[in-house]
Amino acid sequence: MTVSYKIPESVLVVIHTANLDVLLIERADKPGFWQSVTGSKDVADELLLETAIREVGEETGIVVQNLSTPATSSPHQGALSSSVPLENLQDWQLSNVYDIYPVWRHRYAPGVTQNTEHVFGLLVPRDIPIVLAPREHLNFVWLPHREAADKYFSQSIAEAILQLPRYRKL
């Protein structure tokens, strides 16, 4: 039997509007804990951009795509209004290295104790349909970025949110 370990490299995607409202999603495993889209690479050679696109789709139903190319099927894809162009996804060239909680280290190869998280921003219209993955998230809310930063339990997410005015795509 082959053991498949989690890859200690992940993305954090700050989903926001042009007016700097930020999408917060409430964790199903910890009600009251709010976060942005996060997730690890599925395979070592998966590009971070691919990880970000996949995680956004899985967790919110938002399809990030090259709109000049025909859409591929997605479990959450409905009307084109759930789609945003690839150009709206921006790699902020920021990364955070943090210790993996001991309770989760069994998911990683022996000796792995840290994860590197890469930060992206995704500009979306305020009225874009959000379809949460019910096993992962309970609820969502849009808040002004400063108010959103205060609501997050993760310091790295809060710090990324506060950087939004600097990195947002105009």
Regions found by a protein language model. Give the residues of each.
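Short connector loops at helix/strand junctions that flank enzyme active sites
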Residues: P8, S36, T113-E117
